[in-house]
Amino acid sequence: MSIENLKAALPEYAKDLKLNLGSISRTTVLDEEQLWGTLLASAAATRNAQVLAEIGAEAADNLSAQAYQAALGAVSIMGMNNVFYRGRGFLEGQYDDLRAGLRMNIIANPGVDKANFELWSFAVSSVNGCSHCVVAHEHTLREAGVGREAVLEALKAAAIVCGVAQALTAAQTLAAVG
């Protein structure tokens, strides 16, 4: 199970994604923990079993057990937060004065470098389409000294993984009915 398996599974019309996936997996902009945590969290956020299984297996070889769990923790907490903050945003400030009342302890104590956890949360928030969370995590990353290039590289990784998941879902669905 690996990035190579995903590339091989992509249909011809997704050749750009195949090339982008190969490139992002060799990036030098992010360190190994940042890269594989971003790929793992983004894969989980796509909800595509094949993408998660392939990336998850390779991420296990490239991340410590603690970082692996933290990346999955980022996707879990963002699954809740992205819905809450995106939904509250739709309400045009009418509920901004009320306390969320949601437990989010993992954000304060992720078990890994906080900037890496923020990077993974940023990537997942991008996949999930929560502009409030994307902006908040980007601001926190920049305040922590994470460079613009690293932030953009994480965004690219999330976008590529999301595109791969969509291409595979389309190909599998059409193959099943065709």
Swiss-Prot record:
Gene3D superfamilies documented for this protein: AhpD-like
Membrane-crossing residue ranges in chain numbering: none
Pfam families per record: CMD
Disulfide bonds: 130-133
Biological process terms in GO annotation: cell redox homeostasis; response to oxidative stress
GO molecular function: alkyl hydroperoxide reductase activity; disulfide oxidoreductase activity; hydroperoxide reductase activity; peroxiredoxin activity
Domain of life per record: Bacteria
Primary role: Antioxidant protein with alkyl hydroperoxidase activity. Required for the reduction of the AhpC active site cysteine residues and for the regeneration of the AhpC enzyme activity.
Family the entry assigns: Belongs to the AhpD family.
Protein name as annotated: Alkyl hydroperoxide reductase AhpD
Species, as recorded: Mycobacterium marinum (strain ATCC BAA-535 / M)
Gene for this chain: ahpD
